[in-house]
């Protein structure tokens, strides 16, 4: 039930809604700590992780992850509707003057370079849709995309479900500098 009243009805019955939340970086502790603890020790991975943390440090994450089919930058059906919900947040007066950060991720299968390129294509695909859906609200320089590759997994890459969870894009917002 995608309407606000439908989601409120679901919440009133104690069920989990699909309403998006805005989560500050400070509330991402346990999730991001696992990234550091599971991090690779090679220099390229460490640089990507550092860049991710630097960009997201004063940002807030929109609470949905956009999923992709394996090996490509094609959004799944749910992600297409989630982008519309993200656009509603972007267009709200509350976030006027904010920029949007789009972080693409991959599972760990394949080389780091290939996964970084794939995750960048995923982030770019979401960026393109956000720009297309929000003329007058977002201009090219208000949306930045980054490929993070397999650096920050949310699932175990040893299982199909875990790999699916890791093939995602996260959208964050922060005040423009």
What are these regions (language model features)?
Residues 2-99, 175-177:
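Periplasmic peptidoglycan-binding/tethering modules of Gram-negative envelope proteins
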